[in-house]
């Protein structure tokens, strides 16, 4: 999966804007004039821009632009200049931002008169200055509004809340995944498809159509499939060839669960070692699981079938109580393999020539 920039809306709304242009060799005066023109409609009051040598050896530019009215934009590329894209933040404490910019400048440009304001979203300097320190909620809201990717979001959190980042990183990673969900890559099936060589292939086809091939969510629950039979008959390869799936062998690991999968496969796991077997077999929706080394989470937002594969010596049905077996039979199509059956077609022999 690749990281998404998300379809959530970027929002920048402040009278104090802090910009960082990484790997930008332009002179501060040139960038300052361009920024001044960009915010012209909001009546710019002051700008300071400094060139800094970053630890990676590249030149970075830091700029603080103050306006009489709040700059308002939902375009994350609004401050792009000649292909250089900046990190955009509200300057919660303009005094501190200005001090930071003046720390070790290699080149510097200023224009206008600095307005010492510390509270974001003030605007209109005629109403006086405020020394109120921004709250955590205000800082976090600003980060959420300005971040355009998962790495940028986590980087901004790390800079603003270093202690929280170090001690509660898993929570910030969770929120980052919610704000910027991964884009599901196109599924390329690595498992070859084949026609099963079964005595009753029609029953399998009848199960496949509504449970695997028809993906329209009409609210109905799917039906699972249970296959029990000898080893080396192609059960696993056939089951894995049907499409995107969650695959579990030896144990069920919910930490790797993929919500975009069409179906689940439980392969060669004894009945007593399969947690949530009822939810899986019953194709239930929205149930809570407890991944090992992780926190509880809700999975399966829609009904998904599960294909259970078992060898004859690990037949689930032999381990069930009468009540469990009744539930199993009501929610599963059961296919018990006959001798000679395989889940792949025998190779076609070339025709022999008559002598």
Swiss-Prot record:
PROSITE patterns, alphabetized: CRESS_DNA_REP
Cofactor(s) of this protein: Mg(2+); Mn(2+)
Annotated region described as Transactivation, given as residue ranges: 252-270
UniProt xrefs under SUPFAM superfamilies: Origin of replication-binding domain, RBD-like, P-loop containing nucleoside triphosphate hydrolases
Positions bound to a divalent metal cation: 52, 60, 62, 104
Stored Pfam families: Gemini_AL1, Gemini_AL1_M
Keyword Hydrolase: yes
GO MF assignments: ATP binding; DNA binding; endodeoxyribonuclease activity, producing 5'-phosphomonoesters; helicase activity; metal ion binding; nucleotidyltransferase activity; structural molecule activity
E.C. no: 2.7.7.-, 3.1.21.-
Domain CRESS-DNA virus Rep endonuclease: 11-114
Cofactor binding, note field: Divalent metal cations, possibly Mg(2+) or Mn(2+).
UniProt short sequence motif RCR-2, positions renumbered to this chain: 60-62
InterPro entries linked: CRESS_DNA_REP, Gemini_AL1_MSV, Gemini_AL1_REP, Gemini_AL1_REP_central, P-loop_NTPase
GO cellular component entries: host cell nucleus
Region (Oligomerization): 175-187
Location in the cell: Host nucleus
Motif (RCR-1): 18-21
Residues of the active site: 100 (for dna cleavage activity)
Nuclear localization signal (motif): residue ranges: 292-303
Residues involved in ATP binding: 229-236
Function as written in the Swiss-Prot or TrEMBL entry: Essential for the replication of viral ssDNA. The closed circular ssDNA genome is first converted to a superhelical dsDNA. Rep binds a specific region at the genome origin of replication. It introduces an endonucleolytic nick within the conserved sequence 5'-TAATATTAC-3' in the intergenic region of the genome present in all geminiviruses, thereby initiating the rolling circle replication (RCR). Following cleavage, binds covalently to the 5'-phosphate of DNA as a tyrosyl ester. The cleavage gives rise to a free 3'-OH that serves as a primer for the cellular DNA polymerase.
Recorded domain comment: There are 3 rolling circle replication (RCR) motifs. RCR-2 is probably involved in metal coordination. RCR-3 is required for phosphodiester bond cleavage for initiation of RCR.
Family listed: Belongs to the geminiviridae Rep protein family.
Quaternary assembly: Homooligomer. Rep binds to repeated DNA motifs (iterons). Forms the O-complex, which is a Rep-DNA complex involved in the initiation of RCR. Part of the C- and V-complexes which are RepA-Rep-DNA complexes involved in the c-sense and v-sense transcription.
Protein name per its UniProtKB record: Replication-associated protein
Species of the source: Maize streak virus genotype D (isolate Raw)
